[in-house]
Amino acid sequence: MDKSKRLFVKSKQSIRRSSPLIQSGDRIDYKNLSLLFKFISRQGKILSRRVNKLTLKQQRLITIAIKQARILSLLPFVNSSSFVNNAKKKYEKRKSITRTRTPVLKKKKK
């Protein structure tokens, strides 16, 4: 067969579908900083919808929540690397740790 008569065959590319960053139970709110940090770059910019793989409505709500958190100074407008690392550790969802109380020894009266 001539090259000119060959049919064009598309290469089979694997379609990656990553799990969405927003779960069904997550509230998009300016107070939910652990969620908002997922959508901010290291420089402090809001990541695009293509990068986040969010719907238009979710992206709009995330953008509004990030802007509200910045105005209320919960998030900085420009991130420094040290702030991002400290804040992410601080606001990560932590597993509840069961703590036992140690009994307080009372002093005896004389």
From Swiss-Prot:
Keywords, A to Z? Chloroplast, Plastid, Ribonucleoprotein, Ribosomal protein, RNA-binding, rRNA-binding
Name the Pfam families for this protein: Ribosomal_S18
Protein name per UniProt:
Small ribosomal subunit protein bS18c
**What is any one GO biological process for this UniProt entry?**
translation
Primary residence: plastid
Provide the family line. Answer: Belongs to the bacterial ribosomal protein bS18 family.
Instruction: Give the UniProt entry's GO cellular component terms.
Output: chloroplast; mitochondrial small ribosomal subunit
Q: Which Gene Ontology molecular function entries are recorded, alphabetically?
A: small ribosomal subunit rRNA binding; structural constituent of ribosome
Record the organism. Answer: Pisum sativum (Garden pea)
Subunit structure, interactors included: Part of the 30S ribosomal subunit.
**Which PANTHER family does the record associate with it?**
30S RIBOSOMAL PROTEIN S18, SMALL RIBOSOMAL SUBUNIT PROTEIN BS18M
Q: Where in the cell is it found?
A: Plastid, Chloroplast
Which positions form S-S bridges?
Answer: none
Query: Where does the signal sequence lie?
Result: none
HAMAP family hit by this protein:
Ribosomal_bS18
Origin: domain of life: Eukaryota
